[in-house]
Amino acid sequence: MMTSNSYWQRLKVAFQYVMPQIYLTQIAGWFAKQKWGKITHFVIKAFAKKYNIDMSIAQKEQFSDYASFNEFFIRPLKENARPINQNPTALCLPADGRISECGHIDDNLLLQAKGHFFSLEDLLAEDKELVETFKNGEFVTTYLSPRDYHRVHMPCDATLRKMIYVPGDLFSVNPFLAQHVPNLFARNERVICVFDTEFGTMVQILVGATITASIGTTWAGVINPPRHNEVKTWTYEGESAVKLLKGQEMGWFQLGSTVINLFQANQVRLADHLSVNEPVRMGEILAYKK
């Protein structure tokens, strides 16, 4: 017999399939960029109160300092608010949030949530070279809730070699949906960034979600919108190669989402403190060089 709790859970999942994800996201994006003075400041204040956001670490502490909700949402933090671990053999977490999942890639399968797996082929848009690169490697998935700092940083010194935009759905990526929507991260819109590092090839994926109005990178600006119906690839070779330092900002979300890191086999050992649903901060240790 179905309980009222399981009924509502099924209803929430069903709603994700039928709601107009892109239109809702476009509407949210339009509202988020409006500059409505006191109305905007009131909305920001209410949002900060609801999610218990610590404004003391923001460069601009006053709600009235933000002209739009988007400006507030990607607010930069004060210097040293997130110290970067300086151990040269360690990689750092790229974002504030919670660990959604982490661990070993079993041949080409990654754990999404208990009982749910997804493949490297699906996640990496069937890029055969990348799939082979990360078979039997390691992965970490970090979920950024609405209350978190939404700029994304580099785990280590790196050189950008490729960026891939993959169109897709815009399901919510909160932990509940991760447990109930199969192939969630591999079906959502995402931006895949491929780096050369002293820890081997590393991928950092910025995954879109419902109400995530845009994803941007520091070298290319806003990637979406506009949204495209086909995979787009940019390569960065020779003089066009982009070099980034450990802890340096590399991108942002305008509203919450997820970051997935992939590492090659036998290159890194994930930090012992990483565990599912564990709150983490950008700059803390993610992994060590093997």
Curated annotation (Swiss-Prot):
Posttranslational modification: Is synthesized initially as an inactive proenzyme. Formation of the active enzyme involves a self-maturation process in which the active site pyruvoyl group is generated from an internal serine residue via an autocatalytic post-translational modification. Two non-identical subunits are generated from the proenzyme in this reaction, and the pyruvate is formed at the N-terminus of the alpha chain, which is derived from the carboxyl end of the proenzyme.
Pfam name, any one: PS_Dcarbxylase
Keywords (A to Z) from UniProt: Cell membrane, Decarboxylase, Lipid biosynthesis, Lipid metabolism, Lyase, Membrane, Phospholipid biosynthesis, Phospholipid metabolism, Pyruvate, Zymogen
InterPro entries: PS_Dcarbxylase (IPR003817), PSD-B (IPR033177), PSD_type1_pro (IPR033178)
GO annotation, cellular component aspect: plasma membrane
Record-annotated active site: 96 (charge relay system), 153 (charge relay system), 257 (charge relay system), 257 (schiff-base intermediate with substrate)
Cellular localisation: Cell membrane
Gene Ontology MF term list: phosphatidylserine decarboxylase activity
TM stretches of this protein: none
GO BP annotation list: phosphatidylethanolamine biosynthetic process
Catalytic activity: a 1,2-diacyl-sn-glycero-3-phospho-L-serine + H(+) = a 1,2-diacyl-sn-glycero-3-phosphoethanolamine + CO2
EC identifiers of the protein: 4.1.1.65
Residues with the Pyruvic acid (Ser) modification: 257
Cofactor: how and how many bound: Binds 1 pyruvoyl group covalently per subunit.
Required cofactor(s): pyruvate
Keyword Ligase: no
Main location: membrane
Top-level EC class as recorded in UniProt: lyase
PANTHER family, sorted: PHOSPHATIDYLSERINE DECARBOXYLASE, PHOSPHATIDYLSERINE DECARBOXYLASE PROENZYME, MITOCHONDRIAL
Record note on quaternary structure: Heterodimer of a large membrane-associated beta subunit and a small pyruvoyl-containing alpha subunit.
Function: Catalyzes the formation of phosphatidylethanolamine (PtdEtn) from phosphatidylserine (PtdSer).
Family named by the database record: Belongs to the phosphatidylserine decarboxylase family. PSD-B subfamily. Prokaryotic type I sub-subfamily.
Protein name: Phosphatidylserine decarboxylase proenzyme
